[in-house]
Regions:
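Mg2+-dependent phosphoryl-transfer active-site scaffold
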Residues: 3-167, 173
């Protein structure tokens, strides 16, 4: 209800976020986050959720936040490693921001069941190298069986593994 009523229609609220006037707003009050808000100029609740998810050392240090902002503002083209990733990553302008996206990518590209995708997500989050290595092989084989380029699939797996070092599920963000 809150999402539907306040954040769809309250332009003044969004203006406060766009101006970085978020002192006292949990998760949005640090000076770094206020800088990001001023640059990103959020216009919808999904923008705020993505920014909160991406405001972590990994994405900040890797340039993912800058990519998200540039793509959101149309200053940079949204690029997907494979066309099948567009429906999974469109809401975040081609940037992996949530654990659910890792699971969907595993399912879409490699044919993982949701159970297997969750095993991969957990292994990545807990840095269980032995499980990740086994799942990497299954991911690459599954992607190849579906006609995907193995090198692209490997790059995508590495992106997912990198993401797992900082990622949360969407509802946590």
């Amino acid at each position: 209800e809150f999402r539907r009523v306040l954040f769809r229609s309250d332009a003044r609220t969004y203006q406060l976020f766009q101006d970085g006037q978020t002192n006292g707003v949990f998760q949005f009050e640090s000076s770094g986050m206020r800088d990001i808000l001023r640059k990103a100029r959020p216009q919808r609740l999904d923008d705020l959720i993505a920014l909160n998810a991406l405001y972590r050392p990994g994405p900040l240090g890797s340039g993912m936040v800058d990519d998200y902002i540039a793509r959101k503002q149309g200053k940079s083209e949204v690029v997907y490693e494979m066309p099948e990733l567009e429906p999974v990553l469109a809401d975040t302008y081609g940037v992996i921001a949530y654990q659910e996206q890792v699971m969907r990518i595993s399912s879409v590209l490699a044919g993982f069941s949701l159970g297997d995708a969750d095993i991969l997500r957990k292994a990545m989050g807990k840095k269980q190298e032995d499980v990740m290595e086994k799942m990497r092989g299954r991911f690459l084989d599954g992607a190849a069986e579906r006609g995907h380029d193995r090198d692209k699939a490997r790059r995508i797996f590495e992106l997912m593994a990198y993401f797992a070092g900082y990622g949360f599920n969407k509802s946590h963000s």
